[in-house]
């Protein structure tokens, strides 16, 4: 599916770019707790970006569900953490994004469960 390839590549690209920015620039302006949060966010974005690229070529019936759960889950989980991590240096309050992080995580877990189910059902 084209959507999985586009989002997968985009997620990997964002992970690499922000990983470099985080390592070489942000460590000098953000507290360690925010740097660690950004690392987690980018790691999960990378995992699920690569997952989307792999899933896009697999012949599984439930592919559409897994792809949508991974895309929406990654956007909610990783982007909410990224934005919240910059709260300490901005004048904005992004606290309302906090509840989106676990929702995104649940969507990612659901995608993995559906993928596992499709592999178990495989003949």
Each language-model region and where it sits:
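Polytopic transmembrane helical bundles with strong interfacial aromatic enrichment
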Residues: 1-123
């Amino acid at each position: 599916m084209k959507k999985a390839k586009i989002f997968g590549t985009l997620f990997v690209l964002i992970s690499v770019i922000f990983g470099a920015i985080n390592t070489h620039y942000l460590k000098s302006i953000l507290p360690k707790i925010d740097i660690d949060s950004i690392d987690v966010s980018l790691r999960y974005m990378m995992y699920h970006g690569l997952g989307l690229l792999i899933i896009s070529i697999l012949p599984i019936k439930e592919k559409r569900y897994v792809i949508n759960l991974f895309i929406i889950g990654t956007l909610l989980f990783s982007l909410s953490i990224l934005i919240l991590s910059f709260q300490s240096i901005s004048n904005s309050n992004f606290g309302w994004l906090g509840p989106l992080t676990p929702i995104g995580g649940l969507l990612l877990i659901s995608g993995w469960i559906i993928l596992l189910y499709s592999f178990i059902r495989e003949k």
